[in-house]
Amino acid sequence: MMKRETLIEAGIIGGLAGAQVIYAGNSELLSQLLSLGIDPLLIVILCTFASVLLITPLAFLLERKLWPRSLSFKLKIKLVLVALAGVTLFQGLFLEGMKHTSASMATAMPNLCPAFIFVIAWAAGMEKVKLSCMYSRVKMGGTVLCVMGALIMSLMHSTTATLSSVKTIPIVPDEVVVDKDKILGCLYLLLAICGLSSSIVLQASILAEFPAPISMFSMVSLMGGITTVALQYALKGSMEMGSASVIGLGHLVGYAILGGLVSGGGLSFNAWVIKRKGPVIVSLFSPIATVVCVVVSAFTMEESFNLGSFAGMALMFGGLYFVLWAKGKEDCEEIDEMKQDDEESLLRTEFDLQKPLLL
């Protein structure tokens, strides 16, 4: 029994690390596709519908008994909002931001999610904050560090890219050249992470009423794909392939299936791990994708990073772990308090003064 549990623990750790490496490779491939001029919304549409086709049979086999007989109107509204924020808004802005920056920057930004989720949940009244509690203060400090690190990394990364591309222009020491396109890309990424964080908070509310994460992902992906198609028609009036002919429709469909497998499989595995071990351990592995992307970009794309970029990245990772550490400690403290309250309630019931003592 102990050996089986050890193997499961090792499988979880190896699976989480492997998922981040695959995610990093997928991000690098995405960056290459975007550099060819392929429309980001087209990639979102193809990958989303591919995910629906691949994940729906799995949801039917594993979670059919968990489906409710009917969905309430409130639950339907939440599902639509998650589809808009987590699929159309997040993926569209994320790919647009990656197009203007790099895969390394795009994989670094999602590390802001725990801090943003904390702020959104606090504003919505779902997260308790006591200024007298040390863990609450650590979470607030970690959130500030995350945001500061993201801003520093964005500014330094945009400056580095510009200076390395204008070697013939003499650089004045007191003047800093900033690539406005990179700054715009970072803003797209920040907005994308805000959308993702909002959708995660909503998902927690949905799963309390609809405890089938794979089925929820399938439904949200379908609705998100439909809304993205509607957005494509609203913005461009048609489903134009753009520069997709450069690589061929067959290769693009093949990537869509690969992207659907990566996103659908990764999210399903994360949902299983969260159910067994909680969300904290999943978040702890998220910086691996950023590190892999930085290394791959440095060797394959000759992308330069200065000390300021790494300092901002380190600051953001530090803030992330502060938030996760405080959240984990706070959850443990709440569990201990609940156990203590249960024990006190049991004692009061057992030694009720209105009951005669046993002789």
UniProtKB/Swiss-Prot annotation:
It is a multi-pass membrane protein. Pfam families: EamA. The keyword Membrane applies. It comes from the Eukaryota. One of its GO terms (cellular component) is membrane. Keywords: Membrane, Repeat, Transmembrane, Transmembrane helix. It is found in: Membrane. GO terms for molecular function: transmembrane transporter activity. The chain crosses the membrane at residues 5-25, 41-61, 77-97, 105-125, 143-163, 183-203, 206-226, 246-266, 279-299, 305-325. Residues 30-154, 206-324 form the EamA domain. PANTHER family: WAT1-RELATED PROTEIN. Belongs to the drug/metabolite transporter (DMT) superfamily. Plant drug/metabolite exporter (P-DME) (TC 2.A.7.4) family. This is WAT1-related protein At4g16620.
